[in-house]
UniProtKB/Swiss-Prot annotation:
This is Large ribosomal subunit protein uL2cz/uL2cy. Keywords: Chloroplast, Plastid, Ribonucleoprotein, Ribosomal protein. One of its GO terms (biological process) is mitochondrial translation. GO terms for cellular component: chloroplast; mitochondrial large ribosomal subunit. PROSITE patterns: RIBOSOMAL_L2. It is found in: Plastid, Chloroplast. Its main location: plastid. It comes from the Eukaryota. Residues 1-22, 223-271 are annotated as: Disordered. Pfam families: Ribosomal_L2, Ribosomal_L2_C. Belongs to the universal ribosomal protein uL2 family. The gene is rpl2-A. The lineage of its organism: Eukaryota, Viridiplantae, Streptophyta, Embryophyta, Tracheophyta.
């Protein structure tokens, strides 16, 4: 990511960075309005996901996660910013006149050609099922035809490490090793915008535009609001171990549902 550092005497933008190479110019037929329900609230209006709310209005870009334009080559026309995800997106013009958005593969530039199918070259941006061991992939399907569901965030990449029978073994970005069907599609390469974690927003207002509310420590709250709250001055939490706002252990507690149907496909849990 080509970062531009603001050079200004104003404290709010003194250390902010912005990517000048990527702009937003969405196509009307590939976007639609989307109501952001609740923003962290449930149907009763109670907060279920903390630190969410506000944010700028967004138009949803229809992303082609299925890559079902088989054996039809397409050309990358633009690389655009998407407010709904960290990764950038590409506008593809296919040979039959179809236009679609896909996730931007790292290193892809305007003018590159991509294609999806069963017997296509193993090159960056192509979507296929059969590929050699050690291939870096992203946008991986779990169920054939449902579309990519794994490794879709900015900079995400998985690795194909084994094949046996009808199943393939993948190492995911989280460190998890799991099995998927060899009939599932995946896209070759890594998702672009790798340096998203090095981006500096520069001020609190920029984070509010993203729909993220301030995070307050529990130790500075009142006892009625958090188990860590209360005391005189800078008092400790008063417990042996940190807890969540609802009193459960905060560090190391497993939150995955027991006896989940996909447990048999996970060979090693995430780190």
């Amino acid at each position: 990511m080509a970062k531009h550092l603001y050079k200004t005497p104003i404290p709010s933008t003194r250390k902010g960075t912005v990517d000048r190479q990527v702009k937003s110019n969405p196509r009307n037929k590939l976007i639609h309005g989307r109501h952001r329900c609740g923003k962290g609230r449930n149907a009763r209006g109670i907060i279920t996901a903390r630190h969410r709310g506000g944010g700028h209005k967004r138009l949803y870009r229809k992303i082609d996660f299925r890559r079902n334009q088989k054996d039809i080559s397409g050309r990358i026309v633009t690389i655009e910013y998407d407010p709904n995800r960290n990764a950038y997106i590409c506008l593809i013009h296919y040979g039959d006149g179809e236009k679609r958005y896909i996730l931007h593969p790292r290193g892809a530039i305007i003018g590159d050609t991509i294609v999806s199918g069963t017997k296509v070259p193993i090159s960056m941006g192509n979507a296929l099922t059969d590929m050699p061991l050690g291939t870096a992939i992203h946008n991986i399907e779990i169920t054939r035809g449902r579309g990519g569901q794994l490794a879709r965030a900015a900079g995400a990449v998985a690795k194909l490490i084994a094949k046996e029978g009808k199943l393939a073994t993948l190492r995911l970005p989280s460190g998890e090793v799991r099995l998927v069907s060899q009939n599932c599609l995946a896209t070759v390469g890594q998702v672009g915008n790798v340096g998203v974690n090095q981006k500096s927003l520069g001020r609190a207002g920029s984070k509010c535009w993203l729909g993220k509310r301030p995070v307050v420590r529990g130790v500075v709250m009142n006892p009625v609001d958090h188990p860590h709250g209360g005391g005189e001055g800078k008092a400790p939490i008063g417990r042996k171990k940190p807890t969540t706002p609802w009193g459960y252990p905060a560090l190391g507690r497993r939150t995955r549902k027991r006896k989940k149907y996909s447990d048999s496909f996970i060979l090693r849990r995430r780190k």
